[in-house]
Amino acid sequence: QTTARRVAALWLSLVLVAATGASPVHAERLVTDMAGRTVKVPDKVARVATIGPVPVLNSFVFAMGEAATIANNLPPNLGGSRWRFQYVVAPQIATLPVIQSGEGPSVEGVAQVAPDVVLTMDRPTIDLVERTRTPAIYLAWREPDDVKAAMRLLGALYDRPDAAEAYCRYFDETLAKVSARTDALRDAQRPRVLYANLKNLTQPHRIAEWWIAKAGGKSVTDDGRTSEAFNFSIEQVLHWDPEVIIVSAAHEIADAYADARIAGVSAIKNRRVYAVPMGAHVWGNRTAEQPLTILWAAKAFHPELFKDVAISEEVRAFYANFFKSKLSDNDIDVILEGRAGEH
């Protein structure tokens, strides 16, 4: 815990700036973001704009229980039913302005929503936002544990360190719960796993190499790369012979089973093709829901080891405790079956 406190202090220095006789309404604080920048922010943050990978950033805010503070809608390319749970958790964003397009963020849009702070994972955005005299906080998620540093930074920003620590505790405890059952598995007991877009023949996000391993699997695309995407061929799929295939949406399962090119692959023959869940974001990519990803994958890879784990109840509790959102049974089914984009 001492080490954790030191790390938190390094990333999240939060200093009250006292002004003699100043009204509390105008009080300000200094926050150090994940680029090492010291940023002056209002004492109370009530409105935030998210620019860049908006669903990821929103998921951080959701996990703080602060969905109501988001002041902008999703970009146009992220509209439609696939992102429905962004609107379930933060219904107000449906009628709020869009402040970025495929060409990038809009200075006018930022000025229009008048946020207290802009959250971004894009360094060039910082310079643009500062033209509006709006504080910009940079968050990073390069390595798996960065999500905890990001949450602690938001805990400082919202003056809710307790909420940030609750999330970090859940993250660590969930991983420990899975590891307690999978650490003793021999290599032969860990299934070969391919997480992929089979239409484009890509593995879209490097973080999948981490959660597949944490869940007790062996990612066939894990070659130690540092780039995000991984391209491969059908011949490589046949060579890898994955025992489990994970696709990005429910409708892709039927496509995989119908693809004659991979009919002889173990995952196809044994009917072990699954759609990764989709809630606030795709669970296979970067999202605050990542602990749930690992638990879901562990149960998919090792159903006997995790037969006592009710994933649906984990999802219900996570959304209630962190996102402050009550899900129906149908909502949970849609999330877990990867059907968010299907009508």
Regions found by a protein language model. Give the residues of each.
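N-terminal secretory signal peptides that target proteins for export/translocation
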Residues: Q1-R5
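Short beta-strand->loop
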Residues: N72-P75, T120-D122, Y138-E143, L157, ...
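Bacterial Sec-exported substrate-binding components of ABC uptake systems
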Residues: A19-F60, T95, D162-L194, F306-H343
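Alpha-helical, coiled-coil/dimerization segments enriched in small aliphatic residues
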Residues: H205-A229
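Proline-aspartate-enriched helix->loop->beta-strand connector
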Residues: I99-G102, S106-T120, T134, S233-A250
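Structured C-terminal subdomain patch of bacterial secreted/periplasmic proteins
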Residues: K148-E165, D183-L185, I253-H343
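A short, structured surface patch at a secondary-structure boundary
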Residues: T50-V113, V117, G217-V220
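Bacterial N-terminal signal peptides
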Residues: A8-G21
